[in-house]
Amino acid sequence: MSLLDHAVSSGVIDLDKHQPLLDDRVHLCERAGIDPDFMLLAMDESVPPEAVSYVQAYRKLGRNGINGCAITGSMKGLTPMFSRMIGSYMRNFVDANLCSLEVAISPGWRHRSVLMIPDFWLRAKSEHVQGQMLSLMMEREGKQTVVAVADIEACINNCGPVMRDLLECYMVVER
C-alpha cells in the first residue's frame, strides 16, 4: 500500500477536500520546509498530546491570548515532530513553515501564519541575536510561533525579562 493510499484509508487525507493540496504537494512542502511525505502523515506518538491539542486549537489560540508554543525538554527528533505538525497545518490550509532561527530572523519569513523554529534556543546567544529573537517574537504577536527551547529558565536568564513576558503568552509543552 502506498503512503497516499494509507493516508486516505486512515482518514488523514480526504481526497475531495485535499486534492488541490495533493496536486501541488511537492511545491507546497518545499515552501514549508518539509519533505512531501509529511503532508500524508498523521501526528503520532512523537508529538506530545499537548502539542497535538495546540495544533488542533489553532484557530482559537490568538483569541485566547496564546501566541505560540514552546517545546522544552529533549531536543532529539524535533525536526520530524515539527514536520508532522506542519503537515497537519497544511491539511487544514494554514500557511506554516519550518525554518532555522537564522532564517526566521531574516527578512521575509515573519508573515507566515505559523512559524516553527526547532533551534530557537539551544544555548546562549549573542546580544545581537537575542535582540533579533525578541523582535521576531514581538512582531509575531497574533500569529502562532512554535519554538524549541532546551531550557526556558536559561533562555530567560540569557535574554532577560522581556523574554519572560513574551513566553508567558506561550503554551509550554514538555517532551
Task: Please annotate each region the language model reported.
Residues 95-129, 149-150:
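Conserved P-loop NTPase "ATPase switch" module shared by AAA+ and STAND
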